[in-house]
């Protein structure tokens, strides 16, 4: 009798319920064979529920999507907190952690787990790290544990690259001035982007945006582009890497915000630094200087403003993201793989 039930079973949840009900009725009639049937069906029912639960679709969260929704609101480079409920940078943290762990496992299979302890720990406990961080430092996407934290870094943190940038100050400035002449012909020349600010104007000219080179812009500034290739610690192969010229017009205030990660140092080389301009990181103010690099951790709450007059002209810096000096070479390689553009 129980074999006939299995043959006729429609392999659905409703079929299971009907069979179990029939089996229970048989038990009441003291049918010994039905007891075995009910037991088998209960086991199959448990298996069915487990199987259905495993196959529930999970939202796919690519690493790149973390920084995409911001652009739709007129922002770029993860520069400001996004209020959009659809922005993957601000939601779906569980799906993100699963994706990051999958990327780490794939990297370890290809190469090695050696030196991956801190990254593994960071991914495994990402939610706790981000929620427990003090409000003065709160990276929005990825926090690597056990890195020394400070709002500003000394020039010696990445001495080679700082000195190389400062030696090439005049070359970068010259290429910027050529670019900036185009502003007299139209409101926004090709290659420039406008960033959202509560007051004033903030423009950027990207060479590398979220780990992706912008060829058209690089061709307009060949010496600056070659210089980027000479930097030893430039982040160029993952979504946390950016390089651009950043221009603040007089009267501009950038809203306080956090960067996406603590694995990088943001470097500003001053090109034009009139009076009344200031950078505030973690509550500590600093001023730019022409021809000098200013290094800071943008995972700290930070802002910038230009309180000068129109006669002072814009504040201009060359911005590039460098590796945090305490991220080991093996970790850099793995993070480039995990956070590769398009992954």
From Swiss-Prot:
Pfam families: Asp_Arg_Hydrox. It is found in: Membrane. Its EC number is 1.14.11.-. Keywords: Dioxygenase, Glycoprotein, Iron, Membrane, Metal-binding, Oxidoreductase, Signal-anchor, Transmembrane, Transmembrane helix. Residues 1-31 are cytoplasmic. Its cofactor is Fe cation. It comes from Mus musculus. The gene is Asphd2. 2-oxoglutarate binds at residues 202, 246, 266-268, 315. This is Aspartate beta-hydroxylase domain-containing protein 2.
